[in-house]
Amino acid sequence: MNGSRALHLSAWLLLCLLCSAAVARDDSCETCRKLVDRFHKGLENTAKKNFGGGNTAWEEKTLSKYESSEIRLVEIIENLCDSSDFECNHMVEEHEEQIEKWWFKMKKKYPDLLKWFCIETIKVCCPPGTYGPDCLACLGGSERPCHGNGFCNGDGTRSGDGLCRCEAEYTGPFCLECADEYFSSERNDTYSLCTACNQACKTCDGPSNEDCKECKNGWIKDDGKCVDLNECASEESPCKDSQYCLNTEGSFLCKECDGSCLGCSGEGPENCKDCATGYVLLAEKCTDVDECDASEQVCSRENETCLNTAGSYKCTCSEGFEDKEGNCVKIMEAENTEVTDGEMGTSASDINISNTAHEDL
């Protein structure tokens, strides 16, 4: 039992290491591509520079031209990576000699730095249309992976399996077959053009609803065509009692009835099956009952006013009155209203206090 567990653990660890290595290779290629992009940016930024010592002609004659000088290379390398980018800095540190070799010896013969450095020298990337440790051709060929209808897994990297991930219109290992809802409008051994079927078709061999092999859900065959199925025409509505069914192309919507309705067959108060409480059928539509206009008073408290609302009414205290313990009582004005006297602003309360004090004396 222990031996079996150890074997399973070893296999699991090996699988993890292989996955980690594949991810690392993929990341290394991306890092190398970014590094090369930054190198080209550095070339642009330093294109019009010189030694800057004041005697440019002497310096270029004595120290070689700035364009291909070590000083320019150092300036470019110093700006290849952000300080926080560990992978980039590690790659530059590990392969700085190869970068220098390309700069001084190989640049004219191999002007494509990405190809020379990332693909052929440190071997972290592959040429376009190839994948994996040995840069094998993607399915469909390296010139046109997946026949131009998808993406090769691992394309241009030392990882992946080379399998095709097809675009929405295509399927099959080589992305040459048409997916559901598409038909082949052009096809040969190396090329396929898939075009969308009519909206009613699940599968088809042409552009119209007469060309459907199968209908989509929400559509049915009728006289050789796929036509919309009207779900709302069924005896039992697919919607709730408080909703009505609205047919759409290939489907339906459940929409809320008007507030005046108790069940409905469509939008608005004129399509009510019955009127909700507080509404009556008037001129073929459910209309609000104005309870406040009834001959019998509905608000019975003194100093109370009736306010009609949609489907109901409210009893509120009249203007100038407020509700206190179930009764509408008059709102009392503040008693301590100050009356000013002259510029000093003496109030009536001040005068009363003064008079009272005077009498006590």
UniProtKB/Swiss-Prot annotation:
FU repeats lie at residues 191-238, 251-298. Its main location: secreted. It is found in: Secreted; Endoplasmic reticulum. Disulfide bonds join C138-C152, C146-C164, C166-C175, C292-C306, C299-C315, C317-C328. GO terms for cellular component: endoplasmic reticulum; extracellular region. Keywords: Calcium, Disulfide bond, EGF-like domain, Endoplasmic reticulum, Glycoprotein, Repeat, Secreted, Signal. SMART domains: EGF, EGF_CA, FU. Glycans are attached at N188, N303, N352. Residues 1-24 form the signal peptide. CDD domains: EGF_CA, FU. One of its GO terms (molecular function) is calcium ion binding. It comes from the Eukaryota. Possible role in neuronal acetylcholine receptor transport. Belongs to the CRELD family. This is Cysteine-rich with EGF-like domain protein 2-A. It comes from Xenopus laevis (African clawed frog). The lineage of its organism: Eukaryota, Metazoa, Chordata, Craniata, Vertebrata. The gene is creld2-a.
